[in-house]
Amino acid sequence: MFRRKLTALDYHNPSGFNCKDETEFRNFIVWLEDQKIRHYKIEDRGNLRNIHSSDWPKFFEKYLKDVNCPFKIQDRQEAIDWLLGLAVRLEYGDNAEKYKDLVPDNRKNTDNAAKNAEPLINLDVNNPDFKAGVMALANLLQIQRHDDYLVMLKAIRILVQERLTQDAVAKANQTKEGLPVALEKHILGFDTGDAVLNEAAQILRLLHIEELRELQTKINEAIVAVQAIIADPKTDHRLGKVGR
């Protein structure tokens, strides 16, 4: 119940603290006042430190009132939790300069993930070396030139991801197994007067249809790729500020 706050306060046994053990509980209160809260002056802590006194509960009840704790001595767990919260606040206040620059791990991970998700955001597009490198890659990969070098770079990245990765190359190198085609089911529409020529014409027509389908697929892919580039506010300054 108290482990996280005890850990934050560097308590020696945060996982094993037993508030129901009277001796351990009283020692804990003394430690909390001496090391973290420090509400009393050192010379005024004698009664609280005398944990074996039969009057200790009375002194502890007075202590709760002095620190303005809203809970009574009978509400032990609630009082402990409140005192721990007070100690944490005081600890942070004493060490504000130490903790102010700390960033939670989950926030660091989120920031890193955002940077990794869009690595083009922080590039200096006006750097001459950057422009020369992009132009060299575009020429090498035969990519159409564009006034915006960031647009060209994104086009290069898309091409590399889709065509030049290990998986893409392996897929392209796979031998495609053809399917048997019944030529008699495909009507030619004219007759050459020669059965062999008719069959050759049917084959040429089927090959032409296949080429047209592949061309249409490539055109569709190109349209999607271009739309992804020009519709991205990060690469099209007309659609918004860079990085937004």
From Swiss-Prot:
Location, primary (coarse class): nucleus
Q: Where in the cell is it found?
A: Nucleus; Cytoplasm, Cytosol; Cytoplasm, Perinuclear region; Cytoplasm, Cytoskeleton, Microtubule organizing center, Centrosome
- Entry-linked InterPro entries: RTRAF
MF-aspect GO terms: identical protein binding; RNA binding; RNA polymerase II complex binding
Under the cellular component aspect of Gene Ontology, which terms does the record hold? centrosome; cytoplasm; cytosol; mitotic spindle; nucleoplasm; nucleus; perinuclear region of cytoplasm; tRNA-splicing ligase complex
- Cite a single Pfam family from the UniProt record: RLL
The protein's UniProt keywords, in alphabetical order, are: Acetylation, Cytoplasm, Cytoskeleton, Nucleus, RNA-binding, Transcription, Transcription regulation
Residues bearing PTM N6-acetyllysine: 20, 62, 98
Q: Which GO terms describe its biological process?
A: negative regulation of protein kinase activity; positive regulation of transcription by RNA polymerase II; tRNA splicing, via endonucleolytic cleavage and ligation
Quaternary structure per UniProt?
Homodimer. Interacts with FAM98A (via N- and C-terminus). Interacts with NIN; which may prevent phosphorylation of NIN. Interacts with POLR2A. Component of a tRNA-splicing ligase complex.
What family, per the record? Belongs to the RTRAF family.
Q: What does this protein do?
A: RNA-binding protein involved in modulation of mRNA transcription by Polymerase II. Component of the tRNA-splicing ligase complex and is required for tRNA ligation. May be required for RNA transport.
Query: Under what name is this protein listed?
Result: RNA transcription, translation and transport factor protein
